[in-house]
């Protein structure tokens, strides 16, 4: 899609990936960026710079994806939609019913509102959680869905709804294009790291700032693909620009980093004399997840 003069709705725009996507979108000659957010996880501080631009506004009537009529109203006149709103991994673990209503039914509501309003393109925020533990590394997009947690299940459902409704309305006046992005382990500025399983980089830095050692659960052999949120924002804007449709892409570096190596790297960079503190337990949903970025790079 040509972005010049276009209007975009960013659902979940006050969150980590959403706010960085807005920052990148503002570098384009777009006409309007409308933010639809309930500010449950996101906050206006994340939007401080973006809101200085007159092209950016927060939709004032609400920001819940479960409110179908308000969501549809927010989508009127939009050319494209970025959909980031979702309950995070641990909330899905603790509250699966709410996760179903927000992540699955909410995504259906987004798609339904797009069809009603003839919005032409969607960038859907999926997740590497659809893969679960890697059967083979690096994981390509045709890697089997090895997921065993409810968050991953909601993202698989979201992908399949995008595909099903795309094919239902193709070659009609309600047709739309979409792409889904499967982010690897995202880190960076504005990250909310209250959850026990996320934001390991920020938690290590936070401990060091407090004079505490970095904590690593188990032996630290868990390995992930870490991607900076700025790169995720760039990927989202590129996905909106692209001609590709009805497809999913990994967003990662393809670099395998163990938690032990990561902690040692941070200690070296910060010139800290702290030693890694190994602890048993800790909630770990996957132990190895490294994506292949080749398809997205093309």
Predicted regions and their residues:
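Short beta-loop-alpha junction of Rossmann-like oxidoreductase domains
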Residues: 133-135, 189-191, 287
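Short glycine/proline- and charge-enriched loop/turn segments
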Residues: 137-146, 187, 199, 278, ...
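C-terminal substrate-binding subdomain of Rossmann-fold SDR/epimerase-dehydratase oxidoreductases
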Residues: 28, 208-298
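Hydrophobic alpha-helix immediately C-terminal to the catalytic Tyr-X-X-X-Lys motif of short-chain
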Residues: 157, 161, 165, 200, ...
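A conserved pocket-lining segment of Rossmann-fold NAD(P)-dependent short-chain dehydrogenase/reductase
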Residues: 92-93, 173, 178, 182-193, ...
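Active-site loop immediately N-terminal to the catalytic Tyr-X3-Lys motif
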Residues: 96, 147, 193-194, 243
